[in-house]
Amino acid sequence: MSRALAAVGVAALTAAFSLFGQPLARADPDTCPPNCDRIPASAWIDPAAIPLDTSYAWPSPAGVAVFLQRPRFRFEEMCASPPTADDPRDFAVAAKANLANPPGQWQLQVQVLHWRGDSWYGGQLADQVLRSAATALRACRLSAPSTSPSITTDEPGRLSSVLSVAGAAPTVLHSYLVSHPQSGTVAELAMWASSPSAENWPVIPDAQVLDALVAPLCAGYIASCR
């Protein structure tokens, strides 16, 4: 599809997702071509690379992930972020893995979002979603005055933050987001706990977690990084 035709067909593509839901194409469960109707098992972060794995022995997110429509990031719930008009996530192929622990322990959420079709277009959407996330984080205190967001990494395709919530149930959230324009994919890792938490947060560079999120996407979406 040429870029001109793609631009004309955007509205039709969005309508098709709204009317028919999940596309009919099928693919191998472990890997996917760029045009894929699910999140492949190989696209998820290695559980050993998730913070506090030595304490929690996280299972593979792929094993507990569920299909998701209109995904939103964890920080948006804590920030009470208002909906975004024409949000590209509304027609993304997405899945979410929630790994819950008892109160006081760290909770984990991992999401992967993918836009089907030409990678140049999906890549634009992925980058747009990440830029919008950075804007929403900066506006968090406007919609949720009890929050204190701190963006610790804000680079092209990479966003991490620490969000503290005051009040009767103080909470801290560590959030990591990456966009991967080569495959038209966004991945999120979010971990939160009541403050003070039962386990101390480890000293870990943002880049280490962000790299671990993006690393499997080349393998998961075959030919996307050639």
Feature locations, PLM:
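Residues that cap or initiate secondary-structure elements
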Residues: 36, 116-119, 167-169, 195
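Short Gly/Thr-rich strand-loop-strand
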Residues: 57, 64-65, 70, 74, ...
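A short, solvent-exposed beta-edge/loop patch
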Residues: 145-226
